[in-house]
Amino acid sequence: MHILVVGVDYKSAPIEIREKISFQPDELAEAMLRLKGEKSVLENIIVSTCNRTEIYAVVDQLHTGRYYIKTFLSEWFSLPKEELSPFLKFYESDAAIEHLFRVACGLDSMVIGETQILGQVRSSFKTAQAEKTIGTIFNELFKQAVTVGKRTHAETDIGANAVSVSYAAVELAKKIFGSLSNKHILILGAGKMGELAAENLHGQGIGKVTVINRTFLKAKALADRFSGEARSLNQLEHALAEADILISSTGASDFVVSKEMMERAGRQRKGRPLFMVDIAVPRDLDPALNDLEGVFLYDIDDLEGIVEANLQERRETAEKVELFIEAAIVEFKQWLNTLGVVPVISALREKALSIQSDTMQSIERKLPHLTVREKKLLSKHTKSIINQMLRDPILKAKELAAEADSEEKLKLFMQIFDIEEEAGRQLDKSLDNRQTVHSFQKAEAKTGLRPLVSE
């Protein structure tokens, strides 16, 4: 089994490509379920944001995994493979593990240290758990990714003076206008990005805020938080005639503001310039708006320069975060190595349970007068003896599994306890990694042999 990441991000693909390969939040569950049915894919999680769309997968073979995931993306987005392939990035095995941890910590973001991506990774993780598209390996990997991401923000100041794409949009507006105190800001979209834009604008002493959203109640809720005005979407053209700055992030599939709409609104502006920032993927604002006199349009890729100016301190802090990531990688790989020992431990327990069962049957034949209570008591104590006797061998097996030549050492371990045949049967049962630990824990519960050490 191998861990594989396939996708595009802001470094590998321009926005024109990223917006073609972007999953809407309500598509993720269906997409993960469909990908689960692809050949070679054992587990999968999809993370899709404005700056990246990445498929994380456990595959049985790397080359077939790459092929079927690429095929899935091509078919889902109706894009020929030859158009898609030049922009795809691939991470395999250790590099894939490191990449996920860097993403969760915000080190791979356009804005180093931003916190949004951790929430998006966690959200995709929860969706995958709910849809059962992941199993043993990704449950542990993504749990550790979320943990190291949270540790990053708790133990460093990498998120201080918060910077995000929406914050960068505000910074760009300030550079162009100087002060925002007398400016009318129009926020199009009341989702997370719109909310962040409003929060970043709130401390700038802005003159007026108008929020427009497809759902008026959401627009009103956001506007009320910042003493602004809410309007419905059918009032957009009128609002464009009044605003000085537009920050747009609706998540719509088509352009929300067209060149024709802006031309009509522009007749009422009397030559006043309009600064527009499109932080949505796919884009909300027609790129042709840049052709209009007095309109200054920037999209998410244009914000990279603004973002860069705020990041030097975060880069220095990132060196400390790299140490967190290195430790997390070591911890996960140690855990991953122990997966191979699960069938061995199961076989050892099965053999011990068989001996205990045979012993109990022999006792009951020789002592037929035993009461039900006495039989239960004997069974409990014989299992207790087994647990105590197995403790050290199981700990040793786990230590062996973490060593470089673990395969040979575990083979010798199985020979010593004469459990090779049973371990082979246990391994056959657990070839689908999504069932390995679950089956092991289920067997423990059934037999009454308690876990001796935490998994």
Swiss-Prot record:
Keywords: NADP, Oxidoreductase, Porphyrin biosynthesis. It catalyses: (S)-4-amino-5-oxopentanoate + tRNA(Glu) + NADP(+) = L-glutamyl-tRNA(Glu) + NADPH + H(+). Its EC number is 1.2.1.70. Pathway: Porphyrin-containing compound metabolism; protoporphyrin-IX biosynthesis; 5-aminolevulinate from L-glutamyl-tRNA(Glu): step 1/2. The record marks H99 as: Important for activity. Pfam families: GlutR_dimer, GlutR_N, Shikimate_DH. GO terms for biological process: protoporphyrinogen IX biosynthetic process from glutamate. InterPro entries: 4pyrrol_synth_GluRdtase (IPR000343), 4pyrrol_synth_GluRdtase_dimer (IPR015896), 4pyrrol_synth_GluRdtase_N (IPR015895), GluRdtase_CS (IPR018214), GluRdtase_dimer_dom_sf (IPR036453), GluRdtase_N_sf (IPR036343), NAD(P)-bd_dom_sf (IPR036291), Shikm_DH/Glu-tRNA_Rdtase (IPR006151). Substrate binds at T49, C50, N51, R52, S109, E114, T115, Q116, Q120. The active site is at C50 (nucleophile). Belongs to the glutamyl-tRNA reductase family. Possesses an unusual extended V-shaped dimeric structure with each monomer consisting of three distinct domains arranged along a curved 'spinal' alpha-helix. The N-terminal catalytic domain specifically recognizes the glutamate moiety of the substrate. The second domain is the NADPH-binding domain, and the third C-terminal domain is responsible for dimerization. During catalysis, the active site Cys acts as a nucleophile attacking the alpha-carbonyl group of tRNA-bound glutamate with the formation of a thioester intermediate between enzyme and glutamate, and the concomitant release of tRNA(Glu). The thioester intermediate is finally reduced by direct hydride transfer from NADPH, to form the product GSA. PANTHER family: GLUTAMYL-TRNA REDUCTASE (PTHR43013:SF1). NCBIfam families: hemA, PRK00045.1-3. This is Glutamyl-tRNA reductase.
